[in-house]
Amino acid sequence: APARRVLPVFVFDDGADGGRPPGGARRWWLHHALERLRASLSERGAGLILRRGPTLATVLSLVEDTQAHAVYWNRRYDPAGIAADSDLITALRERALEAKSFDGHLLHEPSRLTTGTGGPYKVYSPFWRALAASGEPRAPVAAPKAIRPLPEAVASDALESWSLLPTAPDWAGGLRDAWTPGEAGARQRLAEFLDARLQHYAEGRDRPADAVTSRLSPHLAHGEITPFQIWHALNRPDLDTPARDLEKFRKEIAWREFSYHLLFHNRDLASQNVNRDFDGFAWRPDAGLLAAWQQGRAGYPIVDAGMRQLWRTGWMHNRVRMVAASFLTKHLLQDWREGEAWFWDTLVDADPASNPAGWQWVAGSGADAAPYFRIFNPVLQGERFDPDGAYVRDFVPELARLPNRYIHKPWQAPADTLSEAGVKLGATYPVAIVEHRKARAAALAAYDAMKGTR
């Protein structure tokens, strides 16, 4: 039988379905990802139709225009996406059309893994054990060599009309230097990781200056590579990789799965504390402190390096994400939702599950969260994970000439050392906006006060 005609479509609801519109960094990525997807489909004989608007109305309009008799799409897992998908299936089936959604985003459906009592997991370790015992995820499917298009043209939005790219100012230069959006870029990133970095992953993944992490997160977030493609690639017989590195990386993939499990069972994960005790936490809103953190002017080099890496490249090393998030919520007592919103706007891998789950984990309000009294000392974190200061020197160049012993605590450097390095605290580099011991004491006092009001 001849192949059925296929019309590839990308529907950009941009918040019209009730979900969160993508932030600036993801909008930049989306523009380039769609350009590359369009080129890839063209090589296979098909075009890419772009439509912007609510999913239901947009798809039904296309169905009417094309007289389509079947609609297939990749399933969504954010609350608004789940609701929109459900409405779409109902509407299509009411019209006697075939409607199917597919699991292109996760290893397992978020509802599949349950505890012994049939409930959701709230702790990562047993979730990981259940996932590891659930068998191999399905094998990836190869892309078709050719697609049989519709004989007649179908109206499409012009990608440029969506205005996804920054213009005044164009802040995306660092993103262009750092990333290659699209499926080909994802495949190249995975190949480089497997061939050169995976064998150092378990030992080196916490050192931000060492390029041993996969940096696949933005490709995963945009559906350019799937977790089961990555999972099965780890089974390659020619990989000469120690078992501990393989397991550690698989566990990081499982953290992403766990985040979606949490989102599925906590639909307001980005706006409400999972641990409702934190509803009584006395955050201290301060626009000046928040801005200093956002702009990499906190006066703690490892924190500032992370925030500047984020602004320059749209990405931040995971260890530094934890340190920067802890600093905002515990040293500065700013609501985790402020930090989550900033990451949502500036990360190319901003994810509706991983982003809020990570912030709640650090803040202490989430499922399986780090204890609130675990307050990262940014100096010690820098000295442990960036011992020679290479990461700080890259993103905080005004400190580059400081000796290693002072690179994470410039305020302890003698005056002549600062002078020789061209550093003038309060002028060329900010004075620390809080003192660690005082900030830690204030955070613990706020936590004790919250516990006293329960």
Predicted regions and their residues:
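Generic alpha-helical segment signature
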Residues: 30, 183, 209, 296-299
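Glycine/tryptophan-enriched, flexible segments
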Residues: 118-277, 386, 390-454
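Short, contiguous clusters of charged residues that form electrostatic/catalytic patches at enzyme active sites
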Residues: 32-35, 57, 301-308, 441
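Generic hydrophobic alpha-helical segments
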Residues: 59-62, 190, 306
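Active-site-proximal binding-pocket segments
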Residues: 211-398, 404
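Trp/Phe/Arg-rich N-terminal binding region typifying the photolyase-homology
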Residues: 1-139, 143, 354, 445-450, ...
